[in-house]
């Protein structure tokens, strides 16, 4: 192999005409014309068409006839300009081809579990092979094949370029990159830790870091001044569709700074990395206080690409004749809603009443929903007669409503429930009516978070216990005062997604001790968990602050990729499992004994292979009862089963699936080893409603996996009838 001569497939141009080139890569596609063989050869830079003609080299042609998809090969040949009319506009190299004179097969490939080629070899058009048609677990099981796809290679390259841009920018600002420990001490940071048992120190454990929080603060106390790290973090969280147990974040900390320093450098950094994906962000980023975000959007991650902010109208309708409102208000409740501008025609009475009021709003937790339309300067609805003219005018003025607008209102004694329901309705309606601008990115700083919140009757940190209170003087035993304290914390939100957050840190030991006391930690607990950190605060700690940005989530947004799993080389699946390596797996008994962990752990069975238990799933993992089937998991099942239903039907389906979990132990205990598979003999029908015909599928995408297409025809399996 003479790798020094190698030319990349995607870099061949007309300037190479007449030259001998050496190509190496994988067979992407094959087309056999009987007396001439064409292949697409793919490498990291692109695809080139190679022609095997027996008149040029009979031996190479004969060997090429044995090629199959994904064989790794080397081709030597001469570059030629394609004849007019045979160019392929879908390839960067579509104007040239290579006539092979020599072929070396490095290694062969088995039949593929799914198609890798993304550009079928066709004339004058491009047929895309979509990974959406392949089960995600199958893609992850054969991740090394999945990553061969050009689109996945492009994502990994872009990821590298984005991280490179981050490093170069921070280097210009005199930040230095320092690695912090992976094997560290377990400290309370919001999620559960992954624990690592120590062989040397029997019965003791390290913890994998949820973030480098304490170490980066210690670096500031060490005089480092400006630190950053592309940090790997680990959190043993409950399963969520777009979370990973291990993830990457940009971790950053600086001394002798305030919030404005963080805002300035992070805005510039964010603008730069988004530009790598062709996305322009407006500066300066607007800022919104936490209280305003909750009051007007029902979330601390508001999507400000569209309007529909909430308004409280309780004072306007407190004496209304509408008994539902009046009763809720008398019980201390609230009436709140938003205005949908110019959508009275799109949101018909049937849609508002029978869909949103009766089904969709209740699926979000509401007991109902009130709606009104503005028609010819007046409100119209099925309950408007209970409102005086003054109340109607007051509602229109408060919402800024005009002709053609629709008012959506929720009433309840729980203000938290109102915010949650309105937040879900706002996003649902905006998505349904396509009110969210495409290819629009609106960053936002959310600041002045509460320092503490109440969980299960106990005070806990809203972010983490190292955030500077505002003001710093407070009584750690005064519950009312604690819950009224703000913090110098801030989150960066883009299009309703939190990309990161940070704060100005506590740099005085007395203040830090008061926070620990407010959280209910005793002196002994404080010393055991944080004694090393408190001692560092006694030696002239500088004012400091920082931020952490989720690299995976940011890259997914920059590249418009729906799942963070597609921007990570080897991610875990939705159940925190690795279908490729089958991690996590049972440990050998000898390893457990060496770690002094005793016999309370499941071990590999002697003589049964690595995954021998009958109570394991197909990936070799012990079957455990899921806590709850989420709406995202319902949508995933529906997609695999080719089911289509609306939100209210999804809620019913979710309820039915969760009810099955009540029988989990019974089903798990059934011995099905000798039971033969049975045919489904029940009538298959939709029990919710009559089936609705879907849109007709185009033929070409349906046949996109057919291996060959010529003269308008695909080769497909022939049906043999007896």
Report residues per predicted region.
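Class II aminoacyl-tRNA synthetase catalytic cores and aaRS-like
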Residues: 1-621
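Domain-scale activation on soluble regions of proteins
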Residues: 79, 610, 614-722
């Amino acid at each position: 192999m003479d790798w020094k001569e190698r030319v990349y497939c995607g870099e061949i141009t007309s300037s190479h005409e007449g030259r001998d080139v050496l190509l190496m890569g994988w067979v992407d596609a094959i087309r056999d014309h009987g007396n001439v063989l064409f292949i697409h050869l793919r490498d990291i830079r692109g695809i080139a068409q190679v022609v095997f003609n027996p008149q040029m080299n009979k031996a190479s042609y004969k060997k090429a006839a044995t090629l199959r998809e994904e064989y790794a090969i080397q081709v030597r040949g001469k570059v030629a300009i394609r004849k007019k009319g045979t160019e392929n506009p879908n390839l960067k190299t579509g104007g040239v081809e290579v006539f092979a004179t020599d072929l070396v097969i490095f290694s062969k490939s088995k039949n593929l579990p799914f198609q890798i080629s993304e550009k079928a070899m066709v004339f004058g058009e491009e047929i895309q092979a979509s990974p959406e048609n392949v089960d995600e677990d199958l893609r992850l099981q054969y991740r090394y094949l999945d990553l061969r796809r050009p689109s996945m290679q492009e994502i990994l390259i872009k990821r590298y370029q984005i991280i490179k841009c981050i490093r170069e920018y921070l280097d210009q600002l005199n930040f230095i990159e320092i690695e912090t420990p992976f094997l560290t001490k377990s400290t309370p940071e919001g999620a559960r830790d992954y624990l690592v048992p120590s062989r040397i120190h029997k019965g003791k454990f390290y913890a994998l870091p949820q973030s480098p929080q304490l170490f980066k603060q210690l670096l500031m106390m060490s005089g480092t001044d400006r630190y950053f790290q592309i940090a790997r973090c680990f959190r043993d969280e409950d399963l969520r569709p777009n979370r990973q147990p291990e993830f990457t974040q940009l971790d950053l900390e600086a001394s002798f700074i305030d919030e404005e320093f963080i805002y300035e450098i992070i805005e510039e950094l964010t603008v730069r990395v988004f530009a790598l994906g062709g996305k322009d962000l407006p500066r300066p980023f607007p800022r919104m206080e936490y209280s305003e975000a909750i009051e007007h959007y029902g979330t601390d991650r508001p999507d400000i690409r569209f309007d529909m902010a909430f308004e409280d109208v309780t004072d306007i309708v407190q004496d209304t004749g509408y008994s539902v409102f009046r009763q809720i208000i008398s019980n201390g409740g609230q009436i709140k809603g938003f205005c949908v501008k110019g959508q009275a025609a799109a949101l018909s009475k049937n849609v508002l009443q029978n869909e949103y009021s009766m089904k969709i709003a209740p699926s979000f937790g509401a007991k109902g929903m009130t709606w009104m339309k503005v028609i010819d300067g007046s409100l119209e609805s099925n309950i408007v007669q209970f409102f005086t003219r003054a109340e109607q005018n007051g509602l229109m003025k408060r919402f800024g409503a005009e002709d053609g607008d629709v008012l959506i209102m929720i009433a309840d004694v729980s203000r938290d429930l109102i915010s949650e329901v309105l937040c879900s309705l706002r996003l649902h309606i905006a998505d349904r009516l396509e009110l969210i601008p495409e290819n629009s990115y609106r960053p936002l700083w959310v600041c002045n978070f509460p320092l503490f919140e109440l969980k299960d009757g106990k005070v806990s940190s809203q972010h983490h216990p190292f955030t500077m209170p505002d003001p710093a003087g407070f009584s750690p035993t005064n519950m009312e005062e604690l819950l009224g304290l703000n913090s110098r914390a801030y989150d960066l939100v883009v299009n309703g997604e939190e990309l990161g957050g940070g704060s100005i840190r506590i740099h005085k030991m007395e203040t830090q001790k008061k926070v620990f006391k407010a959280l209910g930690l005793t002196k002994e607990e404080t010393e055991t968990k944080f004694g090393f950190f408190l001692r560092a605060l006694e030696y002239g700690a500088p004012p400091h602050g920082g931020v952490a940005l989720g690299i995976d989530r940011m890259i997914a947004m920059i590249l418009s990729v729906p799942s963070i799993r597609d921007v990570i080389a080897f991610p875990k699946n939705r159940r925190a499992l690795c279908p490729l390596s089958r991690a996590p797996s049972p440990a050998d008994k000898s390893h457990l004994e060496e770690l002094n962990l005793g016999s309370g752990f499941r071990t590999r069975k002697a003589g049964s292979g690595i995954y021998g238990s009958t109570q394991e799933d197909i990936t070799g993992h012990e079957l455990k009862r899921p806590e709850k089937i989420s709406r995202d998991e319902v949508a995933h099942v529906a997609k695999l089963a080719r089911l289509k239903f609306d939100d209210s039907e999804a809620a019913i389906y979710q309820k039915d699936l969760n009810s099955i979990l009540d029988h989990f132990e019974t089903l798990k205990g059934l011995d099905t080893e000798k039971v033969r598979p049975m045919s489904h003999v029940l009538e298959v029908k939709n029990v919710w409603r009559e089936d609705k015909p879907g849109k007709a599928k185009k033929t070409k995408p349906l046949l996109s996996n057919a291996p060959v297409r010529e003269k308008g025809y695909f080769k497909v399996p022939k049906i043999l009838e007896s």
